[in-house]
Regions:
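Non-catalytic cap/lid and distal C-terminal segments of serine-dependent acyl enzymes
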Residues: 1-237
Length: 237
């Protein structure tokens, strides 16, 4: 299904960050009951129709567009390459955009109704931002994460829930996802790790997106996760 099949609305606004960066928001046809903040937002924000087609709570998608420069994209999304660049983008993503969305659309969600999502390199962003802001993002939805950001030796005491997925035909990214699943589990986090037949690309991620949202916020979206890894619950301080 493409965006023409949605009865929701797409709103795009420009920001001054980095000389001009766009954010696209998918607004469901009825009042939102949950919100997903996403990196690579020029892509993920257009998947609202897939959520409408599934039996899911109405979910807003706030998609922050990527940099057109692939190197800068990696530096914004993965904290190890250029910490200053990452921190500037983190401030924009986690604070400026979130506050704008709350003011612009009047939707303020508790952590259990708020997720951060990413695919490939922006999957690293979702993990990094989720670990840094567990009292904002109650769930991390991460597909096919890159290998630039690896689990820290010492995990935060408060962890968001995490759903990780990768395709069986993208072994490098599958290995990255499994590494994170084990590390989060060992730190006491609640984790779902899913491996499905598929390769690295938009079609695979788009098919998985409603399943991620169903896991995070409830509802039915088809297949159940293949593996559930859990640890003791951790609360925010």
């Amino acid at each position: 299904m493409d965006e023409k099949g949605t009865s929701g609305e797409l709103v795009t606004e420009g920001f001054e960050y980095d000389g001009g960066r766009q954010v696209t928001v998918y607004l469901p046809p009825v009042r939102s009951q949950a919100v997903v903040f996403a990196g690579d937002g020029q892509l993920i924000s257009h998947w609202g129709a897939d959520l409408e087609a599934a039996d899911l709570p109405p979910t807003m998608i706030v998609g922050v567009h990527r940099s057109a420069d692939e190197t800068l994209r990696l530096h914004e999304y993965s904290p190890g390459f250029d910490p200053q660049r990452f921190a500037a983008h983190e401030e924009f993503f986690a604070n400026d955009v979130r506050r704008w969305a709350q003011s612009r659309f009047g939707v303020v969600m508790p952590p259990e109704r708020t997720a951060v999502c990413g695919v490939s390199a922006s999957g690293e962003l979702a993990l990094a931002v989720g670990l840094r802001h567990p009292c904002v993002y109650g769930a991390v939805l991460c597909a096919s994460p890159g290998g630039g950001y690896r689990p820290p030796d010492v995990m935060p005491s408060s962890l968001p829930r995490a759903y990780l997925v990768a395709g069986t035909q993208e072994r490098f990214f599958l290995g990255n996802a499994k590494r994170w699943a084990v590390a989060l589990r060992d730190a006491g986090g609640e984790v779902v790790m899913t491996a499905r037949v598929g390769s690295h690309g938009d079609a695979f991620w788009r098919e998985e997106f409603p399943l991620m949202v169903a896991w995070a916020f409830g509802g039915k979206a088809g297949r159940a996760p293949s593996e559930r890894i859990t640890g003791p619950e951790r609360g925010c301080p």
